[in-house]
Structures are given as C-alpha cells and as structure tokens.
Amino acid sequence: MTKNTSLTIFMVVLVIGMLYTSIFIKYSDRTCHVYIKAENCEIDQCNWECGTKYKRVGVQGLCVPPGFDPIDQACLCSFNC
C-alpha cells in the first residue's frame, strides 16, 4: 500500500470513531419522563409500576405534585433514555 492510501484509511477510521463517540455521549445522559395515571398514588406502588414497565437502570417513581392528596396525584416515572 502506498503512503496516501494508508493515511486515507487511517483518517476515515479516525473520523468514524469520533462521530460514534460524540453521538454516544450526546444521548447517553438524557432522562425521560412519563406520567402514569393512578387512582391513589402511593410512592411504593409508583416505584414498583415504573420498575416493571420500564426495565432500565435508574428507574424512579414519584407522586406529583407533592403536598396534594394521593387521589389528586399522578405517578411520574423517570429513567435514562
């Protein structure tokens, strides 16, 4: 192989690696949120429902808005996209 061909192949591999790394880093830290309607929001039930529905690492359930009666709250699931 000539010097130019080797250099071209090296540059193409380098650029593809840089693009892959930047895309992976860009989308790996995003957090998604989904509301689940509940008749009576309880934190343990909310965590369990979120964990079974979204089987991912870092799933957390929270009853929102805080300070309201459980009947008026909804379950907010947060997880890594």
UniProtKB/Swiss-Prot annotation:
The keyword Disulfide bond applies. Its main location: secreted. Keywords: Antimicrobial, Disulfide bond, Fungicide, Plant defense, Secreted, Signal. InterPro entries: DEFL. Disulfide bonds join 32-81, 41-63, 46-75, 50-77. Pfam families: SLR1-BP (PF07333). One of its GO terms (biological process) is defense response to fungus. It is found in: Secreted. Residues 1-21 form the signal peptide. It comes from the Eukaryota. PANTHER family: DEFENSIN-LIKE PROTEIN 122-RELATED (PTHR33830:SF10), DEFENSIN-LIKE PROTEIN 184-RELATED (PTHR33830). Belongs to the DEFL family. This is Defensin-like protein 130. It comes from Arabidopsis thaliana. The gene is LCR28.
